[in-house]
């Protein structure tokens, strides 16, 4: 992600996914901007002289584990119907979708270990699926026992611009 760190900017704190880059340019994914901002280019959010920070994008794998030994304590993995799930928000269809972790049992059958879409196994391993900042995830502990999570990282403690979705693009739970 590219984050605006210029405290004098109207867009201070806003994140944008880096979709491509090389030595001289960065391409940002602006598909998730507000309806009122769709005509804006990256230079609106980051005019010349704006201070920025490049932040690694959190993914299903980097947050919840890339291998069975990385998973939260007491997390149940395996086939979708017998495992615990993480729900992630899909802003395209405005709904949460479940993901499960498939361990090593099915690797010989061509199913590598990793995170899969519970509703569409054919999508393949989705361990690199991005979890956007300020978007919630839901933990569904569908098996017995208590799961324990440990997260590492930093939390912003200064005031930032909060992006609220336009009407009709939110869910109350």
Residue ranges, per PLM feature:
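Charged, amphipathic alpha-helical scaffolding segments
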Residues: 98-154
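Short amphipathic beta-strand/extended segments with alternating polar/hydrophobic composition
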Residues: 15-19, 93-105
